[in-house]
């Protein structure tokens, strides 16, 4: 029996081989115990403040929304140590692993940000680290591969399937099934089998808690909408969690539209997928009529995932959150626009959320909107990818 509810409505669960059930139940018990231990909470908070650099600022853009009455704020997770929101929950899970007596950490990564965050946490806490990464993503994200190795992690390229994040996830789970006695699988997003979606949300929810308090201080009211990109869904659930009960605040998740939904080359299971079981959970996923997982696509490695966390599936099904898609081109335009107008280079993942916020502001220029975009990471890792695209298209003006 689980201690916590493994489902969000009909979504979630523990659809894993029997061999992994004891490991998941052990993890759940350790998490519940840790959440009730003031010493654990204090150590986690100290690491977030003194090592990671929380709280992160809520920055009002000065130039981006000129010509509209929108006040657009950026929640600056890009300023966190490690360069993205990933550091938050990685520190929490790594502390949990030490508490459980584990000596090794297994992780998967797409854009490399989760791998970097895991490597830095393992270096800090004295844990061995191995990271599975799709071979295609290793090519797309060479700077992050080097960062991981520099901090002592072993990076294992995965050549099976589409050589991307879903394949890295499968290999990491296989490894954990054989080594969970001394290893913890440090999952990088709010997806997968219970208790991972709950653990990751709880270790990310300070994003929304801070943003809410900061918005009250600056605007003396709640925002009209909070907007975040959605791959597996950790940065979005971190932003949404504290606003779920504030029904007047729109929760908008932005999935990768890739080359356009009609092309079939996208990563938008919530908007254009169907229900099924994948990666240990029941959620929405991209699958064919035979139930075979279809390959997702996005210019952004961190959003290139064919499913989504179960809490997002639930929020979509009850109408509490809305999920839209943004194409590669729209995200690349927003990437360049933020850099030129504010001097901030965002991650390609975050650029999807930014692009939708700009659409909202410009579609109703006379409306006095207060919008918060979760700028989930910085764009250093993406500059070579973007430079190649801009060079081919001749679009760097």
From Swiss-Prot:
Pathway: Amino-acid biosynthesis; L-tryptophan biosynthesis; L-tryptophan from chorismate: step 5/5. InterPro entries: Trp_synth_b_CS (IPR006653), Trp_synth_beta (IPR006654), Trp_synth_beta/beta-like (IPR023026), TrpB-like_PALP (IPR001926), TrpB-like_PALP_sf (IPR036052). Its cofactor is pyridoxal 5'-phosphate. Keywords: Amino-acid biosynthesis, Aromatic amino acid biosynthesis, Lyase, Pyridoxal phosphate, Tryptophan biosynthesis. It holds the Pfam family PALP. The keyword Amino-acid biosynthesis applies. One of its GO terms (cellular component) is cytoplasm. It catalyses: (1S,2R)-1-C-(indol-3-yl)glycerol 3-phosphate + L-serine = D-glyceraldehyde 3-phosphate + L-tryptophan + H2O. The modification N6-(pyridoxal phosphate)lysine is found at residue 86. GO terms for molecular function: tryptophan synthase activity. Its EC number is 4.2.1.20. Tetramer of two alpha and two beta chains. The beta subunit is responsible for the synthesis of L-tryptophan from indole and L-serine. Belongs to the TrpB family. NCBIfam families: trpB. This is Tryptophan synthase beta chain.
